């Protein structure tokens, strides 16, 4: 399915990733957009409207006959998503753009030949979630590996007074004096940091191998 599932929301890694990406309101938007009861209620309200045009009535009659899965996975404009979910339009747009930037939503543009107006029809792509998480983890693992190489390739010196840590080469340029306070720099043993980095990188690599 392209919409979000309860199984995905119950996955701690997916939940935390989405929470960081779109926030609590964005998560609520995803829940409601994926909940067929919201879609059914919205369609019923549209059909009961006395101001509904004939063309729109035909469209919503067709919508009412859709299966639950087809109804929640249908393309919607941002205005329709706001109506359907009851969430502020600006918040809907902000969430959609964030999802789009991370390949978790996509849109299709249609043009009104009479007015020239463009309408963007949006579709959730939560079926991309595993791929997105894997890519994010690969990027994070790459950065971590780079940090590990840097730490292993350098000796470090630290100022006990203000906490500045610098490399051996940089410390030589200041005659092993702190560039801020002048205190003599002392050798900093980063073996514990290197060990922690190796363990974290190994865990990430195991997770990637099993993804």
UniProtKB/Swiss-Prot annotation:
Keywords: DNA-binding, Transcription, Transcription regulation. This is Transcription factor E. Gene3D superfamilies: Winged helix-like DNA-binding domain superfamily/Winged helix DNA-binding domain. Transcription factor that plays a role in the activation of archaeal genes transcribed by RNA polymerase. Facilitates transcription initiation by enhancing TATA-box recognition by TATA-box-binding protein (Tbp), and transcription factor B (Tfb) and RNA polymerase recruitment. Not absolutely required for transcription in vitro, but particularly important in cases where Tbp or Tfb function is not optimal. It dynamically alters the nucleic acid-binding properties of RNA polymerases by stabilizing the initiation complex and destabilizing elongation complexes. GO terms for molecular function: DNA binding. The keyword Lipid metabolism does not apply. GO terms for biological process: regulation of DNA-templated transcription; transcription initiation at RNA polymerase II promoter. Pfam families: TFIIE_alpha, Zn_Ribbon_TF. Monomer. Interaction with RNA polymerase subunits RpoF and RpoE is necessary for Tfe stimulatory transcription activity. Able to interact with Tbp and RNA polymerase in the absence of DNA promoter. Interacts both with the preinitiation and elongation complexes. HAMAP family: TFE_arch. Signal peptide: none annotated. It comes from Methanocorpusculum labreanum (strain ATCC 43576 / DSM 4855 / Z). The winged helix domain is involved in binding to DNA in the preinitiation complex. Belongs to the TFE family. The keyword Transcription applies. PROSITE patterns: HTH_TFE_IIE (PS51344). Residues 10-130 form the HTH TFE/IIEalpha-type domain.
